[in-house]
Amino acid sequence: MLGLGQSAQAYASDDALNMNQAKDKTYSVPGCGRASDLKYPHRDGHSSSHEQRSGILPTECPGPTLNTGAGSIGIPGCGKVTNRVVSDYNKNARSTLANFDSSKMTEARMNSKNVPIGCQDTSDPHFNGPIDQHVPGAGSPQSQPHHIDAWNSVSSRRADNNNQDMMDPQTASSDRYNEKMMREENSGVSASSYTTKVQGYPASIPSFNQETEEKETYAYGVGDRHNVPRNQIMDETNPSANVLNATDHSISHPENKVLHK
């Protein structure tokens, strides 16, 4: 069964254990393992959160259980899954979870507060970790298919590791500008081109030195002291004022900063 703090993905990957457990189980629902020694909280309008019901998949829950092959114990809950048969190093065929059709799945999150009335909580009731992880299947008889990203763990602090489009730090909000910038300039042609990747925090963004065609070295970054638009230079007589860069008219993107020379 799904253990304390164990993700459904880790549960599904242990095919050998699941197959051994399946030998001692009986099945009253097609494609679903049933066992009197497995208990989970079931909520409806007539029961409390402390009441328990035996089994893996309630009979009133539509749809197949997620399982790792014929005759194996399914992951608690219901959902759609495509099984794929692969061969290991000993050329023994085994079934493994392959492609999830997330548009036809309902989910429960590992947080009992998010389970609505009448739904099957597939998570351990004592799990109070910082991660709300999608577990395929909520077991809700009234559930409607909707899209989720299977196995996408999202922190409760809303931090993620997705790459984002580069934004001007002057216009980006502090919670969204969670980026680390790496910029490469090819300035040997009339128009400059950049390759940008963002990830991290502004405070950790280093400056990168780039030698131009005139052998002048510029440093680019966010943490430097002076912010000067790329098509301007700092007035030597008045450091607080900027003047147009007469040597480089081709660069017209003010979000690309020349910070010091």
From Swiss-Prot:
User: Its domain of life?
Assistant: Eukaryota
Leader sequence range is none
Which stretches does UniProt call biased (Polar residues)? 157-175
Q: Which residues does the annotated region (Disordered) include?
A: 22-63, 121-148, 157-176, 242-261
The chain's disulfide connectivity reads: none
Look up the record and report any one GO term of the cellular component aspect.
Answer: mitochondrion
Is this entry keyworded Mitochondrion?
A: yes
- According to UniProt, the name of this protein is Uncharacterized protein YNL195C
Spell out the Basic and acidic residues composition-biased ranges: 36-53, 250-261
Compartments where located: Mitochondrion
Keywords, sorted A to Z: Mitochondrion
The answer, when asked if Kinase is one of the entry's keywords, is no
